[in-house]
């Protein structure tokens, strides 16, 4: 696997385990500022992008969010049977509190929460109408395996929507290094 330094911070295949452990620790440390940093890194477009992704869900659908983080997207999606998946127990703890509070205020049932990586989703085949992956695909350990798992849990005719700012240039690479410092 090419190193992130050799590709300007971008690795199309994923990240290795050592890099992942460092990233997970940094992400957990960023929880108090996660939304603010995401807004800055996307020049304020993150809310618009999340809204556009939400429009792909229809009432009554079974929806899985892979890499839910602290629940920034999941708290605003309504009328669906929602499952939030993230490898970080700390992110899931924050997401559960945040998302279930929002769902409760709308009279909706709590979401389900699963601690797992995208490359090993412990959910049944052909379960979800939509799978959303916002701002986390770039951090998959193995993108190909993650996509295989997502496609496995999607129902036939279901849709995967990925929304990610990426790290494909020096600016995003620099921004990511500043954020994670």
Q: Language-model segments: what does each one mean?
A:
Residues 1-32:
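N-terminal, positively charged/glycine-rich alpha-helical extensions of SAM-dependent methyltransferases
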Residues 161-181:
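Conserved class I S-adenosyl-L-methionine
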Residues 130-142:
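A short SAM/SAH-binding and catalytic strip from SAM-dependent methyltransferases
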Residues 62, 158-159:
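Short glycine-centered segments of the SAM/dcSAM-binding site in methyltransferase folds
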Residues 42-60:
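Conserved alpha-helix/loop element of class I SAM-dependent methyltransferases that forms part
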Residues 119-131:
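A short acidic, Gly/Pro-enriched loop at the edge of an enzyme's catalytic core
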Residues 64-120:
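Class I SAM-dependent methyltransferase SAM/SAH-binding core
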Residues 144-156:
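A short glycine-rich, Lys/Arg-flanked "PGG" loop and its adjoining helix->strand segment in the class I
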